[in-house]
């Protein structure tokens, strides 16, 4: 049974790396895996905690513009934007969910790419150049039991 094997593999983990690809929503399992990793699961008197999650954006045709684009706010701040319809709601609902919000810029109210969302997005090349940075960021969020984030744990 695939679901049982996945549960066994994920139960003792603390960080989940989600590869954000153009075909992510075609998978029958990814949104379920994310939901499972966000829950506290009890087995034999032991409870697993919410995993930290990092979304690694797959490089396609040499770039990331299939999913990510940059815009400039009226105050001059450059911010990353994403085509939200390309990923599952459980991912979108755990983005920009820091509470209370800590703004990188108080004028335009933009947030940090790493801390403004429970599920941070990072480009594949950036992730591969320093995976520890992004895994540690997700791990720290999970170790604090997602404190400071309004989590959506259901698909």
Where are these regions (language model features)?
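Short beta-alpha junction loops
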Residues: 49-69
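C-terminal interaction surface of TIR/SEFIR-family domains
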Residues: 62-155
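Conserved beta-strand segments of the P-loop GTPase G domain that flank and frequently precede/overlap
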Residues: 18-21, 55-57
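Inter-motif core of Ras-like GTPase G domains
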Residues: 12-18
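Conserved TIR/SEFIR loop-to-helix hotspot centered on a Trp-containing motif
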Residues: 23-40
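Arginine/glycine-rich "motif VI" loop of SF2 helicases in the C-terminal RecA-like domain
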Residues: 39-50
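Conserved BB-loop
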Residues: 1-6, 26
């Amino acid at each position: 049974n695939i679901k049982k094997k996945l549960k066994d593999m994920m139960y003792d983990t603390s960080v989940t790396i989600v590869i954000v690809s153009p075909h992510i929503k075609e998978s029958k399992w990814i949104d379920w895996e994310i939901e499972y990793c966000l829950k506290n699961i009890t087995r034999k008197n032991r409870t697993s905690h919410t995993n930290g999650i990092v979304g690694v954006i797959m490089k396609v045709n040499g770039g990331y513009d299939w999913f990510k684009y940059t815009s400039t706010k009226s105050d001059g701040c450059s911010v990353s934007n994403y085509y939200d319809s390309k990923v599952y709601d459980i991912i979108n609902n755990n983005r920009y969910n820091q509470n209370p919000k800590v703004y990188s810029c108080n004028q335009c109210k933009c947030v940090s790419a790493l801390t403004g969302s429970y599920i941070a997005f990072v480009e594949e090349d950036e992730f591969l150049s320093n995976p520890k940075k992004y895994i540690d960021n997700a791990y720290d969020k999970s170790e604090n039991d997602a404190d400071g984030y309004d989590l959506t744990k259901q698909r």
